[in-house]
């Protein structure tokens, strides 16, 4: 029977890498970040609603959403973040639901890659939750390098979410990503073997 698994974690814990690895095992990925971009793509109703709230500056010269401009505003103004979420979230849910149902109809196991799964209380929409774990210090280091952020800004992003330790305690399974990509792959393979998704290579 097909399963729906929610993959989550904290910012820069390695969720996307885990999703990428899972595709090699035949899982189908429904990515909340991709759906979010689809929800406000050029010419969409969602983008038009964003412009109504955030003004012309919210649209760049290519007719796309100016993510940096909108991101800076909502990071510092919770009321506007809530307004943006009210526009985007229903559209994202509809896109993801359609993708998920399409994969389930064809008998695939589905991974719902949702960074804010616990923050948005979506754990009941999946059969299991797998959390990708790394330490907060590694999260901060990765963010500083990947996004070219200051230490202060990186910490602010990490601490704006439910802590990775708390998410790990709530999860059905935790995937350790404290090491390199090879170790992550080995940890993921072990979980898939234990849960019966793949056969052990020793069998």
Swiss-Prot record:
Name its GO BP terms in alphabetical order.
coenzyme A biosynthetic process
Q: Where is the DPCK domain?
A: 4-203
Which GO cellular component terms are attached?
cytoplasm
Q: Report residues binding ATP.
A: 12-17
Keyword Transferase belongs to the record: yes
- Family annotation (InterPro entries): Depp_CoAkinase, P-loop_NTPase
**Pfam families in UniProt:** CoaE
Q: Would the keyword Transferase turn up in this protein's UniProt record?
A: yes
Subcellular location(s): the record lists: Cytoplasm
Q: Name the coiled-coil region(s).
A: none
Recall the GO molecular function terms of this protein's record.
ATP binding; dephospho-CoA kinase activity
Assigned EC number: 2.7.1.24
Record key words, sorted:
ATP-binding, Coenzyme A biosynthesis, Cytoplasm, Kinase, Nucleotide-binding, Transferase
Q: Gene3D superfamilies under this entry?
A: P-loop containing nucleotide triphosphate hydrolases
Reaction catalysed by this chain?
3'-dephospho-CoA + ATP = ADP + CoA + H(+)
Which branch of life, at top level?
A: Bacteria
Metabolic or biological pathway: Cofactor biosynthesis; coenzyme A biosynthesis; CoA from (R)-pantothenate: step 5/5
- What is the purpose of this protein? Catalyzes the phosphorylation of the 3'-hydroxyl group of dephosphocoenzyme A to form coenzyme A.
Instruction: Write down the HAMAP family for this protein, in alphabetical order.
Output: Dephospho_CoA_kinase
- Would you identify the family this protein belongs to, as annotated? Belongs to the CoaE family.
Q: What is this protein called?
A: Dephospho-CoA kinase
Source species of the chain: Staphylococcus epidermidis (strain ATCC 35984 / DSM 28319 / BCRC 17069 / CCUG 31568 / BM 3577 / RP62A)
Give the taxonomic lineage as stored in the record: Bacteria, Bacillati, Bacillota, Bacilli, Bacillales
